[in-house]
From Swiss-Prot:
A single MF term (Gene Ontology): DNA binding
Organism: Borreliella burgdorferi (strain ATCC 35210 / DSM 4680 / CIP 102532 / B31)
Keyword Disulfide bond applies: no
Enzyme class: hydrolase
Name of the gene this protein is made from: resT
One Gene Ontology cellular component annotation held by this UniProt entry: cytoplasm
Pfam families for this protein: ResT-TelK_cat (PF16684)
Misc. comment: This strain of B.burgdorferi has at least 12 linear replicons with covalently closed hairpin ends.
Keywords attached to this entry: Cytoplasm, DNA recombination, DNA-binding, Endonuclease, Hydrolase, Nuclease, Plasmid
BP terms from Gene Ontology: DNA recombination
Cofactor note: No cofactors were found to be necessary.
Effect of Y335F: Loss of activity
Subcellular location: Cytoplasm, Nucleoid
Protein name: Telomere resolvase ResT
Length: 449
């Protein structure tokens, strides 16, 4: 049985058994103490269905027995609020002040709930349990509880603040610097992420990008699209020339050969190679634990500053620009933790210089798009000013690789240097300095180090 079907069936059994218990209690067939005991057994039997993953931290949350009982108690509390709310609703378009006050009562506030029971003369009544049962009519009740959890998480985001040191103009200059790099495709990837604020896997593989106008790009196919999300595409503002961005995306996909990679492998590559370089380059500029996914959050903040209409609320802007449903504001609150601490007008040239230095320190190999034709290779072999014996041997190895694959043009993609080293070792029985190979390839493929 598929896991989703099994969980749905388990939910249904749980709901029915819970309803049987409360109906017995309402009909005086069970005492309150007996009810509590039965609830404990029920929670024990069904706690497995309450295992789930925290969407905010991606860590597994185990709702154990005590937590399961706590959920049940909180829903009893919620049923008290629900009954009073229904009793005080007179017209569908008008809500009394009392109902507005009920909205501010937490379902965990047992003291307040007891006050409500007393003030509404519900002490000796069991009828409010019927409202509790109503909350369990479908498995939606767990989603409702997850919503309460989500609100608590949003409130925690309000308290947590992470300050971003750079200003808007520095941000734009960083994007220009990264997009125009020819040393490593990872640098262009960071520039694209900062310029458009999309998910890494959308840039790498999943989505299609088109120029909307000189300041906007249209994206089709949204990753992590929820079933009820009717948004299939999104148009958003960008911090660089749309044509340059789209060409960079094509180059990234070509260099990484992502059409042959699964989403899982792409994520694995991001976690290691891409995140490591990102943290090296932006050390002490962004928080040390940040990764390439941080680019999405910082885009949201700076795009609001640069592009949002006057008086538009920030959470609404973030939701809109990311292509989320209007009522799905959790991500917006998550990104709102980041506070732009520097509102100066001028770009920080010293920081840009530092980034340039770090790029030349940490990026020691060529990994952007270049090509070599067989004609150029033949001319290089015939040239008289040969650097050394290893250089000419490298040219011969490359020629043999092209002949083996029947290629007239060889592209300098990521991993080619490793392929050349393996072929060199197989042919000549030894290898030479890796940095020297990088120097040779810059001459052969005609690019600057």
């Amino acid at each position: 049985m598929p896991p989703k079907v099994k969980i749905k069936n388990d939910f249904e059994i749980f709901r029915k058994e819970l309803e049987i218990l409360y109906k017995k209690y309402l009909n005086n067939e069970l005492s309150y103490l007996k009810l509590k005991e039965k609830l404990k057994i029920l929670a024990e039997n069904h706690k497995a269905i309450l295992f789930r993953k925290d969407k905010f931290t991606n860590r597994s949350i185990i709702l154990n027995l005590s937590k399961t009982r706590k959920i049940i108690k909180e829903y009893i509390n919620l049923s008290v609020i629900e009954r009073i709310r229904r009793d005080n609703t007179f017209l569908f378009f008008w809500k009394s002040r009392r109902i507005k006050e009920l909205k501010n009562i937490g379902i965990k506030d047992r003291k307040k709930i007891e006050e409500l029971i007393f003030s509404n003369q519900m002490n000796d009544e069991k009828s409010y349990f019927q409202y509790f049962i109503d909350l369990f009519v479908t498995p939606k009740w767990l989603n409702d509880y997850a919503h309460k959890y989500k609100i608590e998480k949003i409130n925690s985001y309000r308290k947590e603040q992470i300050f971003v040191k750079i200003n808007l103009n520095t941000y734009i200059e960083i994007i220009k610097l990264l997009l125009n790099q020819s040393r490593d495709i990872r640098l262009k990837f960071y520039g694209v992420l900062m310029a458009i604020g999309r998910r890494p896997v959308e840039v790498m593989k999943l989505s299609q990008f088109y120029i909307a106008d000189k300041n906007h790009i249209r994206m089709e196919f949204i990753a992590k699209k929820r079933e009820n999300n009717i948004v299939n595409e999104v148009v958003f503002p960008v911090f660089a020339d749309p044509e340059l961005i789209i060409n960079s995306i094509k180059e990234i996909r070509y260099m990484e050969q992502t059409e042959n990679l699964t989403k899982e492998i792409i994520s694995s590559n991001l976690a290691y190679s891409y995140n490591r370089l990102f943290r090296q380059i932006f050390n002490n500029i962004f928080a040390p634990e940040e990764s390439v996914y941080f680019c999405r959050a910082i885009y949201c903040k700076f795009s609001y500053l640069a592009f949002a209409p006057k008086n538009m609320e920030m959470n609404y802007w973030i939701t809109k620009v990311l292509g989320h449903e209007p009522n799905d504001i959790t991500t917006a609150f998550h990104y709102n933790r980041y506070v732009l601490d520097n509102l100066d007008d001028k770009a920080d040239n010293s920081l840009l210089t530092l980034l340039n230095q770090r790029i030349y320190t940490y990026v020691r190999r060529k990994a952007t798009y270049s090509t070599l034709t067989m004609d150029r290779l033949e001319s290089l072999i015939k040239e008289h000013h040969i650097f050394d014996d290893n250089y000419i041997k490298t040219l011969i190895v490359i020629k043999n690789l092209m002949l083996k694959d029947n290629l007239e043009t060889l592209a300098m993609v990521r991993g080619l240097n490793v392929k050349i080293r393996k072929a060199f070792k197989a042919t000549y029985g030894y290898n030479y300095n890796y940095i020297k190979l990088t120097e040779y390839l810059s001459i052969i493929f005609n690019y600057k180090l």
